[in-house]
C-alpha cells in the first residue's frame, strides 16, 4: 500500500511528527490535510530540535515534497515565518518542494481578534483555544465568506470577497461595541503577504492524483488527535476540524484508499480544558509531566497527564479504521513502580466500554484500571526489541489486546532514530526505515 495516513489516537501530542519523519525517509510526499498552526510537531535530528506548526514533517528531509491540503486553515504570515526560520537553519524550502492548495482558506487578523474576543466573553466557560484564529477561519469557510489563497491573484474577486467578509465581521464587532475594520486595512494586510505566498499555490488535488498514478508513496500527516475531532471528540472542548482518517479525502482531494496508522502515547495527555477520565492530579501526573517534558509545542501550556486509556484509544481506532499502532514515549514510564491501564468506565452504576457523547457524563466517569508492575530499567535510545525489559513487553502486549490491533513500532526517546520495530507492517516494506 503506497498511501499511509498517520492519525493521533488521543488528544494530540502523541508524537506523530516524529513518526512521520521516521517513515518519510522512503516516502515521496507528506501531506497535511486539516488543522492549522495550532498544532505543533517536535522532531529531533542530530540533537537539533525542530518545532513545526504548519509545515509537513517531510521538510526536514531532502528530496521530499511537502503539501498543504485544502482542509488546512492557512495563516500566510505564520507559514512564511516558519519557512524563513527553517531556511536560517539551512533547509531549502521552495515552490518545487512545498505546495499549498489554492483552495486553502486564509487566517487573517480579523479571525484572531474574533477568537480572543469570544474566549474573553466566555469567562469561566472558555474552551481553551490557542487564539490562532483557526475556529473563526473555519466558520467563514463554512459560511461561504472566507478569503482563499486562489483569491489573492484577482483584485476584483478579492474586493468582492472582502466586502462579504467584512459585512459579517463588522456587524458582530458593532454589536459588541468593538472597532470596525476598514477594507483598506485588510487589503494592506493581504498585499503585504500575497507576493510571498502566491508562488506556493497549486492545484493540490490534481497533483496528488497524478502522484498516485505514478506510484509515488504518500504519507498523510494528521494534526491534533481523535478526541479533538469536531464531531467525535469531547465536545465542546475540541478543535474546529475533523481529525480522523476520513478527513484525508476532503482535506486533500485524493479519493484513493490508504493504510491508516494510529499513534498513541504510552500514557495520556491533553492541553486545555475538557473531560479527561484518567487524569492524575497527583504525584503520578506530576512525574509524567516532568519526565515527559509535557509542555505544548505551540501554546507552551502545561499538558495534563494521566494513565493510558485503552477505551479511548480503541474507540479512536474504530473511528479512523486504524490497521496498525505506534506506541510512543515508553521511556517516560521507566521509573514507575506500578503502571495502570484504563479498561472501562463506571457511571451511575453502569459500566461503559466506550466514551459517551454527553459532556456531563464524560466529566463524571470513574476509570476502571488494571495494574502492572513497572520495568524499572532505562530504555531511552534502545534500538533492539529483544533487549527490552520483560515487563515492558507485557505492558505493550496487554495494550495490544485491549485495543484489538497490532502494535508494530514503539518509541523510547525523542530522537529520529529512537524507534523499535516489533512486527513487520503488512504494506510494502519499502515504506519502512531500518536503523
Swiss-Prot record:
Q: How does it assemble?
A: Homodimer.
| Keyword rRNA-binding set for record | no
PROSITE patterns reported in the protein's UniProt record? ADENYLOSUCCIN_SYN_1, ADENYLOSUCCIN_SYN_2
GO CC terms of this entry: cytoplasm
What does the cofactor section's free text say about binding? Binds 1 Mg(2+) ion per subunit.
Q: What does this protein do?
A: Plays an important role in the de novo pathway of purine nucleotide biosynthesis. Catalyzes the first committed step in the biosynthesis of AMP from IMP.
Q: What is this protein called?
A: Adenylosuccinate synthetase
As cofactor, the record names:
Mg(2+)
Pathway the protein acts in:
Purine metabolism; AMP biosynthesis via de novo pathway; AMP from IMP: step 1/2
Q: Where does GTP bind?
A: 12-18, 40-42, 303, 329-331, 411-413
Annotated positions binding IMP: 13-16, 38-41, 130, 144, 224, 239, 301
Q: Which family does it belong to?
A: Belongs to the adenylosuccinate synthetase family.
Gene name for this UniProt entry: purA
Q: Where in the cell is it found?
A: Cytoplasm
Residues that bind Mg(2+): 13, 40
Which cysteines are cross-linked by disulfides?
A: none
A molecular function annotated in GO for this UniProt entry is: magnesium ion binding
Which residues take part in binding substrate? 297-303
**For this chain's UniProt record, which GO biological process terms are given?**
'de novo' AMP biosynthetic process; IMP metabolic process
Keyword annotations for this protein? Cytoplasm, GTP-binding, Ligase, Magnesium, Metal-binding, Nucleotide-binding, Purine biosynthesis
Report the source organism.
Answer: Wolbachia sp. subsp. Brugia malayi (strain TRS)
Q: What EC number is given for this enzyme?
A: 6.3.4.4
